[in-house]
Structures are given as C-alpha cells and as structure tokens.
A protein has these predicted regions:
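Intrinsically disordered, low-complexity regulatory segments
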Residues: 1-145, 151, 159, 224-230, ...
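Short acidic, hydrophobic short linear motifs in intrinsically disordered regions
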Residues: 254, 262-276, 301-308, 470-482, ...
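Structured, non-catalytic alpha/beta "coupling" segments that mediate domain-domain communication
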Residues: 14-41, 174-221, 323, 328, ...
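A short, conserved structural fragment
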Residues: 295-307, 504-513
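C-terminal or mid-to-C-terminal helical accessory/interaction module adjacent to the motor/catalytic core
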Residues: 118-200, 257
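Conserved short loop/turn motifs at secondary-structure junctions
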Residues: 1-2, 85-87, 164-168, 256-265, ...
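Metal- or metallocofactor-binding catalytic centers and their adjacent structured scaffolds
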Residues: 220-265
Length: 780
C-alpha cells in the first residue's frame, strides 16, 4: 500500500521524511495554500452571495508548479495523510488538497493527522490517532476568508470613489487602524502641562540618596501636583531657608512589606510577540518567522518548539511533568512546591492547542548554540526561559517606604526595594512593561525611627521643571495587547496586521513606534463615519466569537454569512447612492495665491492631502510641509551638503518609503515628462548618494535631448533599457525595446548586446543572458 503525507513547508517535509522513510511513507510539502479565490475571472462572484456563497477557486499562481507536481505524486497512492498545521487555516488547506487529489485519484483514502510538535514520537502518535477532516473548522475558515473578501471587495471601491484609487479596507485591519488613529488624535490634541518636582539629597553611612517632597502643610504632594509657578517659588524659597538654617530631616515613619512577583504563564502567540518587541526589538513578523523555523526544525533533525499559533497557555501533562522535574533537578530551591497548570483567560481560546514551549526542556539554549543561530537561538532562549520560569516560585522583595519630616511644614519620602529571593528570576528576566514608567526605587541605608539626617548641600533643594507627556504611541507589542483585549483577530493574524497597514501606507514605524499617516487618518475617518458598526470593537469581537461557534459546530456557516451579508450589502448600496456625483475634492476658503481667482480645492493624494487651483490654466498645487510650485513652505536644508550636479542646496523631503533629500532645483516633471526645474538629482536623507544599480550608458535620448539612455540590471539580472527621464513618452512601460534603440541611435544590435553583456560581467560579475526587449515580452 503506497502512502503519501502532505505537510505545509519543505523544511518540515525534510524533517518528518527522516522519521518515515523506513515505513515507505513519502513526505512532500504543499508550500502553503494551493488554491485561492478566482477574482480575476469571477470578480465579486468569486464568492457568489446570491447563490449560497458558492466559491470559485483557481490554483494559486505562485504555487501552481509545486501543486501540479504534488498532484502527480498523489495520482496513484492508496492513502494520503493530510498533515498541515493544526488550526483552521491548516484544516482548510487540507480540504483543498483533498478536493484536488480526488479529481485525479477517486479511490484514494484520506486521513487527517495533527501534531503540536515535530519529533518522531509526536508524528507516529499523530498517525496512530489519524481522524477525518474537521469540516466545522474548514467552514469556519471559509467564513473568515469569505467575510474578509466581501468586506474588502465592496468597501475598498467606495474608498476609491470617495478618496482616491488604490486604497483598501479590511474586516480586521480597519478596527486596528481605528485603534491607532484614536491614539494619534489623542497625541495631537494633547496640551502639555508644566509642573515642578522638588527633592533633596541626603545621606547616611556614606550612602547618598534622594528624597522627594510629599507634603506641604496638610496637603499631599504627588509627582505632578505643583503646577503653579508662584506657589512653587514661594515654597522653594522656604525650603532653601530651612537648608541654610541647618534644618535636619527626621525619620517619622518606616513602612516595610514583603512583595512577591509571580512568574507569568508560558507563552501564547501574542505574549511571545510582545516580549520579542520589548526584549529583542523585533517586529511581529520577524518573531513569527523565527518561530516557524523553530517549529519545523531548521536543522532537519526535529522541531525545537511546539506550534506557535496558539492562544492557550496549557502544558500537556507529559510536558508539565518534564519541565517540573527538570526544574526540581537543576533549581531545587527555586522550583514551586508542585507543578502549576495554567488556563486561558479567553473564553474563545482556539482549538486544543498547547502553549509555545520547547519540545524537550533538557535541550538548553547553551546546548543548542552550535545548532541554532541568530534569531532562532535568541527566540528559543526566550521560550525556554519562560517555560521553565512558569514552574518556579515567585520572586520576593523587601519593600521599604520612609517618610521624613522637614520642619513641621514639609515631609519628604523615599522608596526602596531589595530582592531577597530570586525565585523564577533565576532563569527569566521580565521585559519592561508596555509604556510603563521606570521605578523610582533607590538604594537605602539602614535607617531607624527618629534618625536625623542632614541635607547634602550642594546641591541642597533640587527643583526640576517638567512637562506632562502625551500618551505614548503604540509599538507592535502594545498594539497586539490592545487587539487581544478587544478580541480582534486571532494568533494567526496578529503579525500580519501591522505589516498590512504599513504596506497600505496607513502607518509608518520608526524606532519601533507606530505613527498613523495623513492617509491612514483620512481612511479611518471615512470608514468610521460610513461603516461605524464594522469598525466597532465589540462588533469585531462578536464576529470572532461567532466564527469560534462555527468551528465548534454550534453555528451554521451559511447562517453566519447571511447575517453578515444582508445588512452589509444594504449599507454599501446606500453609501454608493450617497456618493454618486460627489467629487473627491472639497472646496476650501483659501484663495489661490497664484491666480487669485478661485478658492483652492483639497483632496487626498498618494502622499496625503494636497490643495490645488481648479483652474487648469493656473496649475497651482500645494503640498503642505513641502516645496511646491507657486509658493514656498518651510523646508529643511542639509548643512554642508550641495548637489553634485548643479551646486544647489539639498532639501530633506518626505516620500512614500521614508525621508530622502533632493536638490532645491529639482521641481519634478510635468505630465509630458518635461522638467519643471533645472535639476533631477535625488539622494538619501543624509545627502549621500543612493545605492543605484549598475548602469551602462548607451547614448543620448532622442526625445528628451538632455537625458541618457542606459541599461541597468534590476530584475533577475536581466538588463533593462531606460531613459533617465522616468516619464519617457516612447514606451508606456518605461522600458525601451532594443530595436527602437538600434534604429534611433544607428548602432549595431549585436555590438550593443555584446558591450552591455561584457560590461555587467566584467564590472559587476552579473551574468546576463538577454536584454529585456520591451513591454510585450517577459524576462526569463
């Protein structure tokens, strides 16, 4: 009997293949999804809402060759083990595989095998317990993809009509954008308040430490209490007089307590991503890439962690016993009195997954240094430490708060804490809390009641002027936490949300902080006003709960799709009717400064809002914060950097992919490609030249006169012939056919190809086989 096992990734296939080759089981990989909705042919009918939500599929173009090879392998086998990932998406991929294979092999038997870790024991156990496909999970995944498709397909074109083309809306991305935009608006609306912090330095036993003002008369003083300058000056003067008169601090009260800090549960997807952001500074997608490699077993030996898309912190009984025994052996004083099992706080924790843990706790990070490298090692170390720490005792701190009287009118306070028992901190140091303030604990000497301490002068009384700060921008960790708290998204989608928003141009990420672009704010405002229910956090959370009910068989998938589709389609039709005949531009009250005849119009462009004169003869355009034709805005010039082409000053500008610098004489080009200014030079943000691909100058352009025609290697090492003027009118693809170059410049074709080939080979070691002939041909 011939048997085939299908997993998702080649590396996993290689690893599992080593376990099963003696059994005659061939293992191959689907390389992810094998089919997708046929949007090109069926458009909005790819999921036909008027015909029972019938879906029309096509082989995924990027995976077509591999899928056809896989189908040929399955043509004559007796049994196929569907061993894709143990979640809804994996179940759906298995169903698509089964549907395709059945067309080629009607007598084939299909068995579903699931496993949470990749090692021989787990794989053989999964085969022994093979089941049928879970169609409830398949339907739940179809509902998710169906709603995502319908929402995106019908809502996105409305954005095109209302704002500009190329924008998109999404069932999950739009509520996430709302979260970020609301924070952005909080920051913009924030008005800082000035306050003063008053402290003094004192000492005992040669240990100096600061104490903070905590009482004036009978009034308590908090960190931000003193906001009146006259009040501050009055009491600052009195305090300085007391210091000058040798007034001493008298210990009034010493409060001590034991504070314990418990270990956190083993990782789930969201907490792993949060810690990776805090501790390693990684993006969510980088974290998931490293986790995928650890799960599959990059060395080809076995997987190193359990499945990494989970919202359950549960340890299997076998793993719980193993981790606890390891801790008892290696950390006998720090291990808990008994094994600790954790449970999910979420009622919607998906499927029967475990937490993210090492497949074998005895494989310490140190022992795997030669096997795991770079990101994989760092993430494995974090997972290993967190898993072991979850079975250890709490850390114990002695916390001390000392109150000092400074005359009868003032009190000061000092806080300190000392770690007296490490507990789980033996193996795991927690990352900084999200956007948390730093602890103000200080090292304190041994102090007793009624002790008298003198101020250290200088500095004496220290008064610091400070300002309240706006709410911090989200990073990927804090965004994931908020989405999880709201019940938006699932473990499989957390990493993709920031990436999707960034790719759409709705957000930028700088130093791990997320800023919403003007475009993102505009899109959010439109969706929030026209689709309020669909970006409502509770609605999105309820939708996730319903999908969980479909997955568990408690709700019919068609019923759920109908519940979504009816009201949504009605709203879409209403909005389209409202927008009919409306312009994307809005008239402002600002008169055109160039012609003085018309009010400027405002609309959204690729880089955000811009204003323009409606008179086509005027051609006035204004991009806020940039140089524009007709007037000047405030611009930032680079110091000591001049344009190497014309000697002009270099201006820092904002582009779609970040900041860059440009010559002040570079005004861009008109639609016909003609220059608006006298220069075309652009560079990096610091003024250094861009890393341009190697290019071979062929000759002067016959259309532009002042530009060169050149060959450059960009795509698969195939040279492309272009004009320096990107808007070259001779070819709409911006690429110029070889024949046209030969005819226009009167040069030999064979000689041209030979010279270009030798140039790239000799100068850059690029082996080029042929020139890109023009827009109708495709490079090999």
């Amino acid at each position: 009997m011939s048997t085939l096992m299908i997993v998702e990734s080649p590396s996993k296939a290689k690893t599992i293949g080593k376990y099963l080759y003696k059994d005659g089981i061939k293992v191959t990989a689907s390389r992810g999804h094998v089919r997708e909705l046929n949007k090109d042919e069926y458009k909005e009918k790819a999921i036909d809402a008027d015909n029972g939500f019938k879906a029309h599929y096509v082989l995924s173009p990027k995976n077509k060759e591999n899928t056809n090879n896989l189908l040929r392998l399955a043509e004559n086998v007796d049994v196929v083990y569907l061993a894709t990932d143990p979640d809804r998406e994996g179940e759906s991929i298995s169903w698509h595989l089964m549907e395709l294979i059945r067309r080629k092999n009607k007598n084939c038997q299909f068995k579903r095998v699931t496993y949470n870790e990749v090692n021989e024991s787990a794989i053989r156990k999964a085969i022994a317990n093979a089941t049928e496909l879970n169609m409830d999970m398949v339907h739940a995944q179809f509902v998710r993809s169906g709603i995502d498709f319908l929402f995106g397909f019908y809502a996105s074109p409305i954005l095109w009509k209302a704002i500009r083309s190329g924008l998109s809306a999404g069932r999950v991305q739009s509520p996430a954008l709302r979260v970020l935009t609301e924070r952005e608006k909080e920051i913009a609306a924030f008005v800082p308040t000035t306050y003063w912090s008053i402290s003094l330095l004192t000492e005992k036993d040669n240990i100096q430490f600061p104490v903070r003002l905590s009482r004036i008369g009978s009034s308590k003083v908090d960190k931000q209490s003193i906001t009146d300058k006259e009040f501050k000056d009055k009491h600052l003067s009195k305090l300085n007089e007391l210091v000058g008169s040798k007034e001493r601090l008298v210990v009034k009260d010493i409060a001590t307590s034991k504070v314990s800090r418990k270990p956190k549960p083993p990782y789930i997807t969201s907490t792993m991503q949060m810690d990776a952001v805090r501790k390693l500074g990684w993006s969510s997608s980088r974290t998931m890439t490293a986790a995928q490699a650890l799960f599959e077993g990059s060395s080809g030996e076995h997987g190193f962690i359990t499945y990494h898309r989970t919202d359950s912190p549960v340890l299997s009984q076998e793993a719980l016993s193993s981790v606890y025994q390891y801790g008892k052996t290696h950390y006998p004083k720090a291990i808990a009195e008994s094994p600790k099992q954790y449970h999910s706080k979420s009622q919607a924790a998906q499927e029967a997954h475990e937490c993210i843990r090492p497949t074998d706790i005895s494989h310490t990070p140190e022992s795997l240094k030669e096997v795991l490298k770079g990101d994989e090692y760092k993430l494995y170390e974090m997972i290993w430490q967190r898993t072991l720490a979850s079975q250890m005792k709490p850390a114990i701190f002695d916390s001390t708060r000392i109150t000092f009287d400074f005359s009868k009118d003032y009190s000061f306070r000092a806080n300190g804490s000392v770690l007296v028992f490490k507990g789980f901190l033996e193996v795991y140091q927690e990352g900084d809390e999200i956007d948390g303030e730093k602890d103000d604990d200080v090292r304190l000497p041994v102090i007793h009641n009624q002790d008298k301490l003198s101020p250290v002068s200088p500095p004496g009384i220290v008064c610091e002027e400070k300002q309240t700060k706006p709410p911090a921008r989200y990073n990927e960790a804090s965004l994931v936490k908020v989405l999880e708290d709201y019940g938006i998204g699932r473990p499989s989608t957390y990493a993709t949300i920031p990436k999707t928003l960034k790719d759409r141009g709705y957000i930028t990420v700088d130093k791990n902080r997320i800023t919403v672009t003007e475009m993102g704010i505009g899109v959010n405002d439109f969706i929030s006003s026209h689709f309020p229910e669909y970006v409502d956090y509770q609605y999105t959370s309820r939708l996730e709960e319903k999908m969980d009910n479909v997955s568990s068989g408690k709700m019919n998938w068609v019923v759920m799709l109908n519940q979504f589709w009816g009201p949504f389609k009605e709203l879409v039709d209403k909005i389209i009717l409202e927008l009919k005949g409306k312009s994307k531009a809005v008239e402002t009250t600002e008169v055109c400064p160039q012609c003085g005849k018309h009010n400027l119009m405002e609309r959204m462009g690729r880089m955000g809002k811009f204003r323009y004169c409606p008179d086509k003869k005027c051609k006035y355009i204004y991009n806020p914060g940039r140089e524009h034709n007709g007037t000047n805005t405030e611009v930032s010039y680079l110091d000591d950097v001049l344009c190497p082409k014309c000697g002009g000053r270099m201006v820092v500008k904002e582009g779609k992919f970040g900041n860059y610098s440009s010559c002040e004489n570079n005004k861009g080009r008109n639609k016909d490609g003609s220059l608006r200014g006298t220069c075309t030079y652009n560079a990096k943000a610091d003024g250094s030249p861009k890393n341009s691909p190697p290019s071979f100058v062929i000759g002067k352009c016959w259309t532009c006169k002042d530009c060169n025609i050149y060959a450059t290697s960009r795509f698969n090492n195939v040279p492309e012939i272009k004009c320096e003027n990107y808007w070259h009118p001779t070819d709409s693809s911006k690429l110029i056919p070889v024949k046209q170059v030969v005819e226009r410049l009167g040069i030999d074709e064979k000689e041209l190809i030979k010279n270009i080939t030798e140039f790239f080979q000799n100068e850059y070691g690029i082996n080029t086989s042929k020139l890109y002939p023009g827009k109708k041909a495709k490079p090999n």
